[in-house]
Swiss-Prot record:
Location of cross-link Glycyl lysine isopeptide (Lys-Gly) (interchain with G-Cter in SUMO1): K107
Molecular functions per Gene Ontology: DNA binding; DNA-binding transcription factor activity; zinc ion binding
SUPFAM superfamilies linked: beta-beta-alpha zinc fingers (SSF57667), Leucine zipper domain (SSF57959)
GO-annotated cellular components: chromosome, telomeric region; nucleoplasm
Renumbered residue ranges of the record's region Transactivation domain: 1-285
Post-translational modification: On EGF stimulation, phosphorylated first on Thr-53 allowing subsequent phosphorylation on Thr-51. This latter phosphorylation prevents sumoylation, increases binding to TAF12 and enhances transcriptional activity. Social isolation stress as well as TNF-alpha also induce the phosphorylation of ATF7. Phosphorylated in proliferating colonic and small intestinal epithelial cells. Sumoylation delays nuclear localization and inhibits transactivation activity through preventing binding to TAF12. RANBP2 appears to be the specific E3 ligase.
Protein name as it appears in the record: Cyclic AMP-dependent transcription factor ATF-7
Record keyword Cell division present: no
The bZIP domain, residue ranges: 332-395
Organism field: Mus musculus
Length: 413
């Protein structure tokens, strides 16, 4: 046995024998490889596990700051507008130009622009007598709240004003188009109610009443505008795509239009002489972005106060219409439509299969004809080879052939 395997491993504790030296070299190499992996050293550097798991990915994102909210341009504009309002308010009581006063343009035979300005400016009421003579001691209207509200006759007719705690963007310009003469005239009530406007410096300015103006009953907005601005940091009602406010305690656009219409109608009916309408300062009917700063008020042919029309610019979204339609359908009708669709699909599939089969048949015919042509060529070539062989055998003993063989033999040598 030892003669068959003369090569012994010299490693301690290993007495294996091998037939040749190559096997022994491979075995020793295995010993060297195992000896290199000794016990783990305690002073070696511990490598941290950096496997990219989802938890570590989210942690890295939080450390870098990817989950932080980006600074919005609207918030920057809001802060800038609030700083400007604070600077203007701290400048002095006399340096007040009502930064967000809207202009009302009443279109009649000739367009007239009425710009409401502070009481100390001479252009505030160009056609009004002194304010103290026209002031009536009936129920005054204090313009303080930032949004319009509906009031009944005999109560406060209009609430519009400026609130320094809720600064707004540059106010929209309202364009009021006078209604055609075929519409009804709004009469004034028995008792005229004066309007008092609170300015930003704390002064109260009584506004004179004006002649009755025909007001429209439908307000068509050129663009969807939310009644309450959604400012970051200030809670507000969520607004969906069509511009309507969520029904959690907030009015829908139709209710807001009815409110605004009723307020304007009551205000105009309470005005019976003077320079026209009274406009609040910053928070007017609708607070909008600068690019949404025009509200066009038009009168339809036959308006209905209880059912305000919706302009084409505000399409009502039909959510879930397809689902409701499928629910309302009869099951037999649904099954019939399903079978019709199946029949149409089956006919299309049969047509495709027929075209495929016809193309395969054409290809098979072409290949068959080509095969027949090739077989004919092979037969002709075989016949020609046979004829040539016969000629060669016939001229086997010819002197010319013998001479050729001799010359070929000499050339071969």
């Amino acid at each position: 046995m030892g003669d068959d395997r003369p090569f012994v491993c010299s490693a301690p504790g290993c007495g294996q024998r091998f037939t040749n030296e190559d096997h022994l070299a491979v075995h020793k190499h295995k010993h060297e490889m195992t000896l290199k992996f000794g016990p783990a050293r305690t002073d070696s550097v511990i490598i941290a596990d950096q496997t990219p798991t989802p938890t570590r990915f989210l942690k890295n994102c939080e450390e870098v700051g990817l989950f932080n909210e980006l600074a919005s341009s609207f918030e920057h504009e809001f802060k800038k507008a609030s700083d400007d309002d604070e600077k203007k308010g701290a400048a002095g009581p006399l340096d007040m130009s009502l930064p967000s006063t809207p202009d009302i343009k009443i279109k009649e035979e000739e367009p007239v622009e009425v710009d409401s300005s502070p009481p100390d400016s001479p252009a505030s009421s160009p056609c009004s007598p002194p304010l103290k003579e026209k002031e009536v001691t009936t129920k005054p209207v204090v313009i303080s709240t930032p949004t319009p509200t509906i009031v009944r006759p005999g109560s406060l007719p209009l609430h519009l004003g400026y609130d320094p705690l809720h600064p707004t963007l540059p106010s929209p310009t309202s364009v009021i188009t006078q209604a055609p003469p075929s519409n009804r005239q709004i009469g004034s009530p028995t008792g005229s109610l004066p309007l008092v406007m609170h300015l930003a410096n704390g002064q109260t300015m009584p506004m004179l009443p004006g002649p009755p103006v025909q007001m429209p009953s439908v307000i068509s907005l050129a663009r969807p505008v939310s009644m309450v601005p959604n400012i970051p940091g200030i809670p507000g009602p969520p607004v969906n795509n069509s511009g309507s406010i969520s029904p959690s305690g907030h009015p829908m656009p139709s209710e807001a239009k009815m409110r605004l219409k009723a307020t304007l109608t009551h205000q105009v009916s309470s005005i019976n002489g003077g320079c026209g309408m009274v406009v609040g300062t910053a928070s007017t009917m609708v607070t909008a972005r600068p690019e949404q700063n025009q509200i066009l008020i038009q009168h339809p042919d036959a308006p209905s106060p209880a059912q305000p029309q919706v302009s084409p610019a505000q399409p009502t979204p039909s959510t879930g219409g397809r689902r409701r339609r499928t629910v309302d359908e009869d099951p037999d009708e649904r099954r019939q439509r399903f079978l019709e669709r199946n029949r149409a699909a089956a006919s299309r599939c049969r047509q495709k299969r027929k075209l495929w089969v016809s193309s395969l048949e054409k290809k098979a015919e072409e290949l068959t004809s080509q095969n027949i042509q090739l077989s004919n060529e092979v037969t002709l070539l075989r016949n020609e080879v046979a004829q040539l062989k016969q000629l060669l055998l016939a001229h086997k003993d010819c002197p010319v052939t013998a001479l050729q063989k001799k010359t070929q033999g000499y050339l071969g040598k």
